């Protein structure tokens, strides 16, 4: 009887240890990710704070129009399926309606 109690206590302790270990690893990974995000946020803030007013204006006047022009040219690439796939679907629907009418 004493052996069964000792074995059950030992198994319970091992199970608890096995369940607690992944939780601590998950928490440490979560804290590591938060630290990385806060470091990158701080460096961005420091970079923006270190720029002079003229440098900020230069970035706004040159970089933003360039980005907007790239985005406006890239609109065709955002919807590559528009002509290719939907035209076939419309033909399929038209053929289906013609078959049921005749």
Swiss-Prot record:
<feature type="propeptide">
    <location>
        <begin position="21"/>
        <end position="45"/>
    </location>
</feature>
<dbReference type="Pfam" id="PF00918">
    <property type="entry name" value="Gastrin"/>
</dbReference>
<dbReference type="GO" id="GO:0005184">
    <property type="term" value="F:neuropeptide hormone activity"/>
</dbReference>
<dbReference type="InterPro" id="IPR001651">
    <property type="entry name" value="Gastrin/CCK"/>
</dbReference>
<dbReference type="GO" id="GO:0007586">
    <property type="term" value="P:digestion"/>
</dbReference>
<keyword id="KW-0372">Hormone</keyword>
<feature type="signal peptide">
    <location>
        <begin position="1"/>
        <end position="20"/>
    </location>
</feature>
<comment type="similarity">
    <text>Belongs to the gastrin/cholecystokinin family.</text>
</comment>
<feature type="propeptide">
    <location>
        <begin position="96"/>
        <end position="102"/>
    </location>
</feature>
<dbReference type="GO" id="GO:0030424">
    <property type="term" value="C:axon"/>
</dbReference>
<keyword id="KW-0165">Cleavage on pair of basic residues</keyword>
<dbReference type="InterPro" id="IPR015499">
    <property type="entry name" value="CCK-like"/>
</dbReference>
<keyword id="KW-0732">Signal</keyword>
<keyword id="KW-0765">Sulfation</keyword>
<dbReference type="InterPro" id="IPR013152">
    <property type="entry name" value="Gastrin/cholecystokinin_CS"/>
</dbReference>
<dbReference type="GO" id="GO:0005615">
    <property type="term" value="C:extracellular space"/>
</dbReference>
<comment type="function">
    <text>May control digestion processes.</text>
</comment>
<keyword id="KW-0027">Amidation</keyword>
<keyword id="KW-0222">Digestion</keyword>
<protein>
    <recommendedName>
        <fullName>Gastrin/cholecystokinin-like peptide</fullName>
    </recommendedName>
</protein>
<feature type="modified residue" description="Phenylalanine amide">
    <location>
        <position position="92"/>
    </location>
</feature>
<keyword id="KW-0964">Secreted</keyword>
<feature type="modified residue" description="Sulfotyrosine">
    <location>
        <position position="86"/>
    </location>
</feature>
